[in-house]
Amino acid sequence: MSREDASQIVEQGDIFFFYRPKVGAEEVSSAEDVQRFYMVTALEEKDRKYRLFILGRKKLPEIVEGKSTSEERNWALNTLTTNNPEDIRKELLAAEYETETKGKRRVAAAAPAGEGKYSIVKHDNHTEFVYALELPEVPGPIQREFEIKKEASYIMSVKNPDIQIPGFKTFEKRTPQYPESLKKEFGDRRWINIEDPKLLDYENTQLLLIGARKKDVEEELGINLNEEKETANTAEIFRELKIRKDQVPLKPLLKGEFPGKGEQQPMAAEVKQLSREEAPGRGGKVGGKAAATRAPSAAAIAKLLSGINFPKRKNELIVHAEANKAKVEAAEEVIQVIKELPERTYSNMADVEKAVAEVR
């Protein structure tokens, strides 16, 4: 069987990557300064369909040729599917909300970090999510930070919402409302391939991405993504999604560079107002992972870290938590949160709880 015979395109279109800085961040120099990392797909068909996904760990899975790593897999969560690109644009706007202790807070608009073409391909006995980057022409520091490659592919599977899986317990109250016709496709399997792309259309659809390849992707799969040479004047991200150039920093998209201090938050003409329930950390779409999942209780974290002698680095927190797994129900869920904490030294439990609030 030839490579071309082995691959079948399930769907294809345009892909866009965005990141949103943390509340109050004046400058972004790494993923630690980022609240959310987004992926937007725009299906290539007469009636365009747009999907907004949140990526876990604030980056794509790592791909290391010929080597398996702990970072090679990641989750993605559908938070919006629409036929109107204006809905996507509004989700990415700057936002303001009121807090009881600090008054009005502002969240910067999501900044574009990449544009390209994507395909979902049925290959042998699995499906792969494939993309080729058009902007920036040469990936820079900001793309490396989010693991955005010039081209890459990932084995992609959809989670059965009726089966609880270790590491996905945080999603148990966020389940996609599939019709019976799609539910039947899962049977008793935990994960299924994406042979029907409608599986991706439902809010709260949960995906697993496993890094597969990062070079010669089109040749290996026998497909053509039809990527084009784009500029600031031709970029689909501005034409298709109606993102205004004066409202977002352009360096990440066009040069692959982090914006300098004062460049991260242009004077946006449009700012949406959030309720307290929509605010970061309260379940809203603007926040960190907490906005997509339930944050673990402080008591659960304290149990896993009981007996620890501070100060400790993050890796030491993880080791201690792993040793105390038997003390906490759904310990893997809590340990996953600890793994997402910023790389720094923690002086006490208050430091840990503050960091949890940053990522959740």
Label each PLM-derived region with a short phrase:
Residues 18-20, 56, 78, 121, ...:
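A structural detector for beta-sheet-dominated domains
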Residues 47-93:
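Acidic, aromatic-enriched beta-alpha/helix-loop junctions
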Residues 26-30, 44-46, 66-67, 325-334:
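Intrinsically disordered, low-complexity coil segments
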Residues 103-279:
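A eukaryote-biased signal for long
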Residues 272-360:
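Basic helix-extension-helix modules of the SAP/HeH family
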Residues 22-24, 44-48, 57-62, 82, ...:
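Conserved beta-strand elements of beta-rich interaction domains across eukaryotes
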Residues 1-57:
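Long, contiguous regulatory modules within eukaryotic nuclear regulatory proteins
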Residues 88-108:
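Intrinsically disordered, low-complexity juxtamembrane tails/stalks of eukaryotic membrane proteins
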